[in-house]
């Protein structure tokens, strides 16, 4: 690992005092893996507080500036409309941006952007806007979704706006996807994913994380399996792919939110495990050695580092491990180095978005301990810094990329080794409606031996609206299973009343070929047949269930296609396969139990009217982890619905909300612990936004919501618990509260 390029005395000063370093001083304060170097791309005053970026076809950077985020430890001024979307350009060709244009200003905490056709999607909570681009100026503004990011704090709102290979736009911290069709915007339900940042691999599978988990991801393509709202989760989605959450900062990290807690820091006062994991990136640039291809890099701004993970596939499942122990791909001794997002670049380098500031913890959960750390080293200001770096092989000339506009030249780029270029070529063909290239695209489908090229050609045809059933049928027999899976996924776009019987016959042939790798995909896609012939789909459903009764991925895929008919199919399958230990029966029981939990019959309008402030607090503070239905969200938090922790002793509930809860917790006879949930609920004792009455109302609200029916909580109840435990900093454990 390349060492620090500054003397020991300067290192000690940087660690002790956290001074504001210039970009030229910041790079020598970093360690990067041997064989690589960090290069400056942009810095203040050209850019301020960046949180996300997109590259256009000219290699320019479109960046989001979230200038209003946490101006001080209580967030005063966060609602000032000072956020911007800017365009950065390197006009002299030296690799460093030297020109800035403001495309859009007066935004309140903007958080994501996406270039598409002749416009730009911009996420400005609660809205998602599409803004036409007229010669680099903002034109007509169209509201795409007024509830893109409703409520929640800045750490827990949707973001990402990733253009998937399947021509849909996906998000983190969201269960929605979007697509532009002519002048219309389509919105569909998808699986809930992640917290901050989202990425995809060469075949379009998605990867994400939450603040305490290194990497989560999907085994299957994102378009599938989100049709049955009764399923709390579908096997193969939101999988904990790298279970090792250790981090290895190169400086003491006492300035983390719970640095006071035992086990949070090691003996050298360095963070032990992720606490702000974000911005995952599947590296697809083709510039690094082949060993780095589809490695996943993860940012950790609290520990001032970027981690590298290596993935390994086994069938359709994926698991990974950290690339090495005891060190990181990139780390800094500069406390203000805050990598919050990572991107593949047109040149194949990794681009690091550095918010460069002292405060990154949002006020809702900011502890008094961290406030003192911030004050001790003067981390509140400045607020106008920001950097973009790129990591590239040391000494290697990295050339800027200008995308061609000729249709055939773009088709030729679908085989480029750089995934960013392939994606951009596909997007430009689709955005430009270049249907003249369909012969060349179909030639790729028939003749190319490169599975990545085949998949891009297929999805380009789909994006242009000219994919035909005849295009995908041969791909069902392709030697590469990912091509077969992609073709089965694309079937949703081409199955109609004329060809669904042929598709059903293809599914039977796939079953006969013992193609277990695509078994979940044919199960998911029964809904395509059911739209035209439900009895035919039902027969296939039973045949697949009988063939794969102990495959939980197939089981959940099948259940995803039978919303509101779960009991009927469960009785049928139990008659044929009575063994309750089989995966198909276990997954049915799980889904039916979730359905039962949701049958509360509560009058939500009446409850919201009775507790208006509580309804607002729940939406902003609680819903992002515990869900609208109170049944919890996978990888984040356990249920509140029918939880004895909620409906039981109100003093314990108040203590949890004020001081937090850490470690395993049992709800309805099920033990919830990391990685199924985050492993910690932060307390609200130090919140400047919520008083005792707000907390009392909110606890009354959840004790009487969903299937819960317990007594209310008063302001006096909250005060008594606060007086009992005072300024305790440690969160409770479940065992401690049982005493």
Predicted regions and their residues:
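Beta-propeller domains with acidic blade repeats across secreted/periplasmic ectodomains
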Residues: 1-409, 430
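Flexible coil segments in periplasmic/lumen-exposed cytochrome c-class electron-transfer proteins
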Residues: 3, 14-17, 599-609, 667-739
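Structural detector for internal amphipathic alpha-helices that build alpha-solenoid repeat scaffolds
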Residues: 397-399, 422-433, 452-466, 471-477, ...
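Short inter-helical turns and helix N-cap capping residues of alpha-solenoid HEAT/ARM repeat scaffolds
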Residues: 417-418, 449-450, 479-480, 514-516, ...
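Electrostatic cytochrome c docking/interface patches
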Residues: 590-618
